[in-house]
Every structure is written in C-alpha cells, then in structure tokens.
Amino acid sequence: MSASPEDFERAAQLRRELEAHDHAYYVLDAPTVPDAEYDRLFRELDALERRHPELLVPDSPTRRVGGAPVPGLVPVRHAVPMLSIRTETDTTSGGVIAFDTRVRNALELGPHAPPVEYLGELKFDGLAISLRYENGMLVRAATRGDGYTGEDVTHSVRTIRQIPLRLPGRPPALIEVRGEIYMRRDAFERLNARQSETGGKVFVNPRNAAAGAVRQLDARIAARRPLSFFAYGFGEIGESGGWNMPATQGEMLDALDALGIPVCEHRVVASGPDGLIAFHDRIAAARDSLPYDIDGVVYKVNRFDLQRRLGFVTREPRWAVAHKYPAQEEITELVDIEIQVGRTGALTPVARLKPVFVGGVTVTNATLHNEEEIQRKGLLIGDQVIVRRAGDVIPQIVAPVVERRNGSERPFVMPQTCPVCGSHAEKQPDEAVTRCSGGLFCPAQRKQALLHFAGRRAMDIEGLGDKLVDQLVDGGIVSTPADLYRLGLVKLANLPRMADKSAANLLAAIEKSRHATLARFIFALGIRNVGEATARELARHFGSLDALMDADIERLQQVADVGPIVAHSIAGFFAEMHNREVIEQLRAAGVHWDEGVPAVAADGPASGKTFVLTGALPTMSRDDAKALIESHGGKVSGSVSKKTDYVVAGAEAGSKLAKAQELGVAILDEDGLRRLLEQPA
C-alpha cells in the first residue's frame, strides 16, 4: 500500500525534529530531549520509511547508520585544490613576527601603514575533508589526498551526526566546505576501552582512529566511531543567489555557523602580530584542557581581497601559516633496545623505556630507526634519555643525559642474523637499514611475501588478498609461496567466510599461475630493488633462472639499469639458502615459465600514444611506469606539448601538470593509467 499524504507529512515532521535534536546535541552540546525520546522518534521514522520506501530521502537521519560496503574509494579531483599551509619553524613569538613581516612586504606596506588584520584559529590534529553541497544537499565528501585529487568518502561522512545532510535557508547553489574530522579525547578513551574489552584493535591516537574510520569501505565502521567535525574554510562556490558572500575569514566562519556547520569557538581577530602572540600563548596554556588534540595554531590574513593579492607560492598560500608548539619532553631510562623485523625485512631497533608521561600519553617505546641513529646519538642501554613526542604524535629519543651515567651502561650491538628466522642480516653500503635476507622464508615477512608473489603484476593469483593471507598464515596453513600450490579444496573451504565456489575459484587461479613468464617469476620473488622493468631486463639478459641465480655481482652489473645497489640485492637474495630452498619447492610444485620476454603490444589503447610522467606515483617507480607503458606500445616523453596524449601525475606534480592543464591534455593518476592499459585492444 502506498504512503498517504499524512504519512508524507509525518515523515517530514520527524526528520525536522530529529535534525533539530541532532544539531542541539552534537553541535551546540545542549541536548533538548532525553535519549529515550530521541530513540522513539528515530524508530518511528525508520518504521515509516521501511513500510513506505517512497518516503526515504537522501538527507534522512536514518541514512546516517551506514549501509552496505562500497566496492572501493573513487578518486575525486578537487575543483579548488586543498593545499597545505606552511609551517613556521620558529615556535617562539619570532615566528609570528616573521610571518607578519612577509605579509607586509608582499603587500608593499610601509612602516607607517596600519597593521594587517589577521584571524587566529586552532590547528586540529585530524583528517582534512571537503564537503560538497548542491542545492543545500550534501552530495559528496572527499579527502585531501595530494591536494589535487582525493578519495570519495561520502558513505562514511554521512554517518557523522555533526555534519548536516541538508543546509538550512538559501545557501549558494554550490558550496564546498573545508574542514577537519577529528575525535574528542573522551570519545577516544571510550572507544579504546570498548576495543580492548572486545579484543579489537586498540588505537595509538585519536587521529588514527578517525582517519582510519573515514577511509573504510564499510560505512558502519565510521558510524560506530564517535567522530566530530570542525569547518575552517570554503572550496568551490557557485552562484550565491540571495546568500551574502563573506568578505573576511571571520565572516566566513560566522556564515558557516549560521548554516548549522560546526566551527571552533577558539578564534580571534587580531590587528598586527601582538594579538596573534597573545592568542598563541593563551591556547598553549589551555591546550591540555581542550577536549581534542591540537598541534598548534593557524594565522590567516582576515580579508579575502588581501588573500587574493598575496596569492600562493608553489603549493602554499602566502596569506596563512601554521605555528606549531614545541614538542613536549621528559627524561626517563632506556631500559633495553630490541629488534623488530618488519614485513619488508627491515631490522628496526626499538627502545624499551621506563614508562613516562609525555605529550598527554604514557610512552613505553620509541623507534630508533637504525643502528646509525643509535651511534649518532651516542645512546647506551641503561642511559637516562630525553624523550620527545615529535609533532605530538611519534615518541622519539632526542639524546642521552650523559652527566647522569654511572658506569653500568652498555653499548648496543646490531645482530648479524635475523632474530625471527636466523637468516643472514645484511646492510647495503649506501643504506642505513639492516635487512633480513630470508625474504621467502622469514615468518615476519610471510604475509608481505605472499601478497607480493600473488599480485596482479607478479603471479597474478586472483582472490588471494590481505584477509585470506592473514587466515592462511595465522592458521599455520601457509608459510612460503610454495605452500600455496599444496592447498586443497577441503582445507580452503573450511576457512571462515570461504564458500566452496570461492575456494574452487582460488584453486583455479593458483593452478593457472603455475605457468608464468620468467620476468613475472623474478618479480614475484620480491627481491629488494627489483621492479617489473628490472625483472624483464634480467630475464632478457640471462634467459634462465639458473643462470641468474649463479651470476656474480660483476656479471649482474652488465645488465641494463642494474647498478651496484641492485646487483648486491640480487646476489644477496640468491646467496641465502632459505630462498633457494623455496624456489626449488616452487619448481617441484610445477611452477614453470616461458624463457622469453613478452612482445610489445602492437595494438591497444596505449599503442602509438605519447605519455609524460610527473610527480611520485603511489606504488610504481618512474622506471616501472615507463616500462609498463612501453610494454603496451606507448612512448614516454620528458616534456608536455600539444602532441602529448596523456600526463600521468602523482604526488608533488609540478610544472608539467600545469602545462597539461593549460593545453587540455588528458591527466591520469596511477589507477587511471592501469585502467587504460587494461582495456581490450
């Protein structure tokens, strides 16, 4: 039965009431009804919408609970870049004066000109986000990403009750609100207590808990975490209609507040640097009592017309600066130095500290990065050391307090073998990191080795992802890549959330992977510094795996693009007998390959096209990206022109990206490049 006019009217009334209660509770911190009454209204609306689906609208409060997981995070290009703000390195009042001097010089203001008006705000320790409203409706939320391209996280952001799904009044037809998603300290403590009770992951700090929730594919995770939001600016704005466009940063925050969007009350309009210094000192004194984490304050030229005159330098506005506080320090004992083996085989010294309260948390461990850092800082086990929470997040040891030594201290000695698997530990001449050489054998590296081996660009075992690898390794079913080829249907099907069909599909993918190319197999081994392009050159040069395994460093360096560093990596990998044993197990399991190099694609989406690479790609080196394009028939050029077909842009892309935008050249990120190359010929 369809909904009656009374049903439509009641649903609209319930939505208005719930939205008003949400705003009072989550934004104003002034609840207007008891929880039981709110729950009753919510259940009534939910029941109405379930009974009559035609009543459901995108901005209904019932949509905040989170729906089915999305298949993936889609890239979003920011119409107005979300650029970072320069950090003033001088944490004293001198940093404020330096900023004011730069602004006055850029505006060509003489010594007798009136002081510049600024707005002082807090610098939140959270996740930057952009909220896009069209005709008053929230249509998209995106992360900052690299400033130019972020990720669509609308599904998660909808669950944050502080963020309105619909703006009241008559806002511009299009408005992007920029701000920060964060988690209050008390909410973070409750979350971690709940996680600990249920055996879940305990988070290091509120920022990690907030950012991790927003970027989940399943919005229900964000809905279960107590996330908050503060707005601090605009992005793209369309026709204003009857809305009064703000002329200053302060007016903008007031306008956002009038739209029901949360803004922080701790802000000040200051004339000249003196008011900013007073604001900096006042917030520093109140910092520990704030209900959320901050790592500094932000100063902005208040007038928008002056902001436009000042403009930008590279990726930063001239009209704003972040002024961080000095990291907090304490002294404690360096009880011991232990070695952790990471997923990539890095042996990392970790300081075990006598518990000390610093920067708002109790610190018991600190990373020492590598042996050279320990020597550079002159640390001895048993030292009294200065511990700092750098950036208020990562604990680090600054230095020993030498005058407190009593003679019982002892030096740290880096182990010569991996403490996990016993393989030889080695350090390249130009590297500071010591690494385990048992890449295919070491338990600490198992999961990473299996994921790399099964990757699409390696042995291409479809269906073998992170969660399944966790189950296989944690359950003791798989230890090395060779064990994959011993899996049976019954053992796989008995795993949690693994149906017979999924198990059969995985076994089929494993079976298919038995036949590869030599280049793919070499890449799949996960030899450090050996990417796809180098693997192809090695396969082309040696023609067989045995010849490669027996090659010495001198012969390895005869291969194109293989220098001393790569040659030592390859030789060290094959010198470890554990790795050779796994390779022989793979051969015995029927893994084989064509001793040749794949032909360059003669026809396809990249064939005959000219590409230009700029910036740092997330997972590929520039050489790997170049080789991948060329293997599909494309050509890579060093400069952008009208003849350029595509520009592949990563983080920190520079003038080439700007030139491409000017010429209207198609721009791809790494995922876009892969999708293009995967298109059928």
Curated annotation (Swiss-Prot):
<dbReference type="InterPro" id="IPR003583">
    <property type="entry name" value="Hlx-hairpin-Hlx_DNA-bd_motif"/>
</dbReference>
<dbReference type="Pfam" id="PF03119">
    <property type="entry name" value="DNA_ligase_ZBD"/>
</dbReference>
<keyword id="KW-0464">Manganese</keyword>
<keyword id="KW-0227">DNA damage</keyword>
<dbReference type="Pfam" id="PF12826">
    <property type="entry name" value="HHH_2"/>
</dbReference>
<feature type="binding site">
    <location>
        <position position="421"/>
    </location>
    <ligand>
        <name>Zn(2+)</name>
    </ligand>
</feature>
<dbReference type="GO" id="GO:0046872">
    <property type="term" value="F:metal ion binding"/>
</dbReference>
<keyword id="KW-0460">Magnesium</keyword>
<dbReference type="InterPro" id="IPR018239">
    <property type="entry name" value="DNA_ligase_AS"/>
</dbReference>
<feature type="binding site">
    <location>
        <position position="144"/>
    </location>
    <ligand>
        <name>NAD(+)</name>
    </ligand>
</feature>
<keyword id="KW-0234">DNA repair</keyword>
<feature type="binding site">
    <location>
        <position position="418"/>
    </location>
    <ligand>
        <name>Zn(2+)</name>
    </ligand>
</feature>
<dbReference type="GO" id="GO:0006260">
    <property type="term" value="P:DNA replication"/>
</dbReference>
<feature type="binding site">
    <location>
        <begin position="84"/>
        <end position="85"/>
    </location>
    <ligand>
        <name>NAD(+)</name>
    </ligand>
</feature>
<comment type="function">
    <text>DNA ligase that catalyzes the formation of phosphodiester linkages between 5'-phosphoryl and 3'-hydroxyl groups in double-stranded DNA using NAD as a coenzyme and as the energy source for the reaction. It is essential for DNA replication and repair of damaged DNA.</text>
</comment>
<feature type="active site" description="N6-AMP-lysine intermediate">
    <location>
        <position position="123"/>
    </location>
</feature>
<dbReference type="GO" id="GO:0003677">
    <property type="term" value="F:DNA binding"/>
</dbReference>
<dbReference type="InterPro" id="IPR004149">
    <property type="entry name" value="Znf_DNAligase_C4"/>
</dbReference>
<protein>
    <recommendedName>
        <fullName>DNA ligase</fullName>
        <ecNumber>6.5.1.2</ecNumber>
    </recommendedName>
</protein>
<dbReference type="GO" id="GO:0003911">
    <property type="term" value="F:DNA ligase (NAD+) activity"/>
</dbReference>
<keyword id="KW-0862">Zinc</keyword>
<dbReference type="Pfam" id="PF14520">
    <property type="entry name" value="HHH_5"/>
</dbReference>
<dbReference type="InterPro" id="IPR041663">
    <property type="entry name" value="DisA/LigA_HHH"/>
</dbReference>
<dbReference type="InterPro" id="IPR033136">
    <property type="entry name" value="DNA_ligase_CS"/>
</dbReference>
<dbReference type="InterPro" id="IPR013840">
    <property type="entry name" value="DNAligase_N"/>
</dbReference>
<feature type="binding site">
    <location>
        <position position="324"/>
    </location>
    <ligand>
        <name>NAD(+)</name>
    </ligand>
</feature>
<dbReference type="InterPro" id="IPR012340">
    <property type="entry name" value="NA-bd_OB-fold"/>
</dbReference>
<keyword id="KW-0436">Ligase</keyword>
<dbReference type="GO" id="GO:0006281">
    <property type="term" value="P:DNA repair"/>
</dbReference>
<feature type="domain" description="BRCT">
    <location>
        <begin position="601"/>
        <end position="681"/>
    </location>
</feature>
<dbReference type="InterPro" id="IPR036420">
    <property type="entry name" value="BRCT_dom_sf"/>
</dbReference>
<keyword id="KW-0520">NAD</keyword>
<feature type="binding site">
    <location>
        <position position="180"/>
    </location>
    <ligand>
        <name>NAD(+)</name>
    </ligand>
</feature>
<dbReference type="Pfam" id="PF22745">
    <property type="entry name" value="Nlig-Ia"/>
</dbReference>
<feature type="binding site">
    <location>
        <position position="436"/>
    </location>
    <ligand>
        <name>Zn(2+)</name>
    </ligand>
</feature>
<feature type="binding site">
    <location>
        <position position="121"/>
    </location>
    <ligand>
        <name>NAD(+)</name>
    </ligand>
</feature>
<dbReference type="InterPro" id="IPR013839">
    <property type="entry name" value="DNAligase_adenylation"/>
</dbReference>
<dbReference type="Pfam" id="PF01653">
    <property type="entry name" value="DNA_ligase_aden"/>
</dbReference>
<keyword id="KW-0235">DNA replication</keyword>
<dbReference type="InterPro" id="IPR004150">
    <property type="entry name" value="NAD_DNA_ligase_OB"/>
</dbReference>
<dbReference type="Pfam" id="PF00533">
    <property type="entry name" value="BRCT"/>
</dbReference>
<keyword id="KW-0479">Metal-binding</keyword>
